[in-house]
């Protein structure tokens, strides 16, 4: 699992018109995929997945990304872009939406169908926007263009 460097307390100030990319999980491990992109005081989240525990984690069902960096900034989040429907990319969405339920979820038809089913179990009704290959969307300060990618699950986008 990834752990923060003990000497780092907070990131340096972001330059004017700068972009900061903050991985909150998924580095050095297979799972907990979650990346935050910061620009102009706004945040875009890409994926929000779980990590399945190994044998040396008895009694633990799921391991979530570390939400601490964004917990106090949930009002700055423009959207959560979901690249595909694997649990290591969507499994933590219900836990993040407990902090702020009205964050838009952006993804392909299959990906959103999978997360909507998961959110029904948690009694969360999401706001969603279905996107397709080649589509461009303005998500607050972020201009996004979606591209189809090959993966072991259909309807994956980058």
For each predicted feature, which ranges?
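Pre-active-site segment of Zn-dependent metallo-hydrolases
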Residues: 27-32, 39-82, 94-103, 107-111, ...
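Conserved phosphate-coordination/catalytic loops
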Residues: 61-64, 87, 150-153
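Histidine-centered divalent metal-coordination motifs
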Residues: 79, 83-90, 151
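Metallo-beta-lactamase
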Residues: 1-22, 38-49, 110-156
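Catalytic core of the metallo-beta-lactamase
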Residues: 17-25, 30-39, 135-158
């Amino acid at each position: 699992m990834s752990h923060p460097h003990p000497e780092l307390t907070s990131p340096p100030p972001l330059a004017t018109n700068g972009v900061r990319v903050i991985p909150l999980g998924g580095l050095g491990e297979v799972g907990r995929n979650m990346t935050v992109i910061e620009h102009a005081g706004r945040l875009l989240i890409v994926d929000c997945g779980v990590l399945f525990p190994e044998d040396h984690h008895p009694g633990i069902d799921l391991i979530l990304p570390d939400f601490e960096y964004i917990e106090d900034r949930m009002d700055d989040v423009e959207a959560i872009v979901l690249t595909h429907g694997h649990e290591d990319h969507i499994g933590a969405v219900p836990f993040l939406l407990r902090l702020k339920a009205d964050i838009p979820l952006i993804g392909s038809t299959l990906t959103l169908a999978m997360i909507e089913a998961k959110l029904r179990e948690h009694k969360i009704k999401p706001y969603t926007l279905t996107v397709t290959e080649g589509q461009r969307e303005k998500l607050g300060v972020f201009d996004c263009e979606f591209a189809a990618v090959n993966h072991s699950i259909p309807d994956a986008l980058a």
